[in-house]
């Protein structure tokens, strides 16, 4: 998912 939390996904 795009967004500030996208960097939390592998």
Swiss-Prot record:
GO biological process, any: killing of cells of another organism
A GO cellular component annotation in the UniProt record: extracellular region
Tissue: Expressed by the venom gland.
Keyword terms: Cytolysis, Secreted
Location relative to the cell: Secreted
Keyword Secreted recorded: yes
Nuclease in keyword set: no
Other facts noted in the record for this chain: The primary structure of the mature peptide is identical to that of cryptide To27 from Tityus obscurus (AC P84676).
Protein's job: Causes weak hemolysis. Does not cause mast cell degranulation, LDH release and does not have antimicrobial activity. In vivo, causes intense edema formation and intense pain, when injected in mice hind paws. It also induces discomfort and anxiety in mice, as it highly increases rearing behavior (but has no effect on locomotion).
Name of the protein described by the UniProt record: Cryptide TyPep-5
Organism: Tityus serrulatus (Brazilian scorpion)
